[in-house]
Amino acid sequence: MFLAQEIIRKKRNGLALSTEEIQFFVKGITTNAVSEGQIAALGMAVYFNDMNMDERIALTTAMRDSGTVLNWQSLGLNGPVIDKHSTGGVGDVISLMLGPMAAACGGYVPMISGRGLGHTGGTLDKFDAIPGYQTEPSSELFRKVVKDVGVAIIGQTGDLVPADKRFYSIRDNTATVESISLITASILSKKLACSLDALAMDVKVGSGAFMPTYEASEELARSIAAVANGAGTKTTALLTDMNQVLASCAGNAVEVKEAIDFLTGAYRNPRLYAVTMGLCAEMLLLGGLATDEADARAKLNRVLDNGRAAEIFGKMVSGLGGPVDFVENYSKYLPQSQIIRPVFADTQGYAHSMDTRELGLAVVTLGGGRRKPGDALDYSVGLTQVCALGDKIDASTPIAVIHAQSEDAFAQAEEAVKKAIRIDEVAPEKTPEIYAYIRAADL
C-alpha cells in the first residue's frame, strides 16, 4: 500500500519512483483517490527533478492503461497499424494526406487527433470544415472505417487515457506543461492506447514550434523515441522545420483545399511534400511495408500518381458522414470568407524570416483558432498564398492573401502579417525541411 504524499515526497527529494508507485498514483488520478493538490505537487516535483527513462516508460504505460486500450486483432487486419503524431505548427496539414497515402500502401491508420489551441491549428478543426464529417463517431463506426477504408481521423473519445485529461488540465493551471517527461507521457499515452505497431513522430523546430529552441525540440524527440520504443512500439522521431508556414496556407477550409490539391496532384507545395514523404516513408519502413527508403518513396509516389490516395481520402470522408463527392466538388462544400484580398509588403527584396507563431495568431484573430477551449470557429477564414522564405518580393507580389469576414478583421490581420514576415535585400540561407531522424538505433 502506498501513500500519495510519500510518493510526492520521494520525487521532491530527487529520488526515482518505482513502477508500482507510478501505477498507484496514476490509478488515483483516474479514480479521484488522489487530490488536485497532490497531482499539482507531483507535477511540480517532476518539473524540477525530472524522471529517468524507466520512470517515463512506467508513467506513459500507466496512463495508457488508465482507460480503454484499442484492440485491432478481432478485425483481422491484413497489414500493420501505423500512425503519425505532430507537436503542432502552422499550416501543418500533413495528416490529411499522410493517412490516406499510408493506407493506400497497405497500412491501417487509426489516427486520433486534437483541436487547435494557441497559435497552432488542429487537425480536427480542419475536418469540422467538412459538412457532415463526424469527428466523434461511435467506436463501432471508427473501427469499421479503419477496417474498410484503411484510415479514420477522429477526436479522442472519453474512455481513452482519462488520467491524461485530468493530469493535463491541472498541469495547464499550475505551470508544469513544459516538463519533457510529462509532455512525453501525455503525447505517447494517447498514441499507445491505439495499440500501434509503429509510429512516426514529427517534432517541430523553429519560430512556430511548441518547444522554444532546437535543443529543447531535440530533447523531446529523443525522449519520445526512447519511451515509445521502450514501451514496445517501433518509433522514429523526425525534427522538422517550422520557421515558416509549412503549407502555402493556414486556416481550416483553406488547408482542406490544399490537402485535396496535394492528393489529386493539382498543386504540391515542395516543403509540404518533403516533410509528408519523410514521415510517411518512415511509417512504411517501421511497419514493414517497404524494404528501404527508396522503395517506400516509390510506393508513396505511385499511390499519389494513380489517384488511390485521393480515392481513400474521399472514402474516409463519406464513411464518416461527409459528402460522397467531396474530393471532386470540395468547392461546393467548403465555406468561403466575405473578403479575400492580398497583402503587400512595404519594401522590396526577399522574404528573409518569418515569425510563424505570429502568423498562427493572426489566423486566431480572424476567428480561425481558439483563444480558449470551447470557442466557436469560423472555418472559412485564414491565409493563403503565403510566401516562402527566399521568395523575391516586389510591389506586385503579395506576401499572403487574407480570408476575412470583415474590414476590421482584415486590417488587423494585414498588420500582423506585415509585421511577421521580414523582407531583406539579401536572400536567407536555405534551411532543410527535415533536420534529423532519431531512430531506435540512435538512442
UniProtKB/Swiss-Prot annotation:
A cellular component term, taken from the record's GO annotations: cytosol
Record note on quaternary structure: Homodimer.
Lineage top rank: taxon: Bacteria
Protein name in UniProt: Thymidine phosphorylase
GN (gene name): deoA
Organism of provenance: Shewanella sp. (strain MR-7)
Keywords: Glycosyltransferase, Transferase
Gene Ontology biological-process annotations: pyrimidine nucleobase metabolic process; thymidine metabolic process
Entry function: The enzymes which catalyze the reversible phosphorolysis of pyrimidine nucleosides are involved in the degradation of these compounds and in their utilization as carbon and energy sources, or in the rescue of pyrimidine bases for nucleotide synthesis.
InterPro entries reported in the protein's UniProt record: Glycosyl_Trfase_fam3, Glycosyl_Trfase_fam3_N_dom, Glycosyl_Trfase_fam3_N_dom_sf, Nuc_phospho_transferase, PYNP-like_C_sf, PYNP_C, Pyrmidine_PPas_bac/euk, Pyrmidine_PPase_CS
Family: Belongs to the thymidine/pyrimidine-nucleoside phosphorylase family.
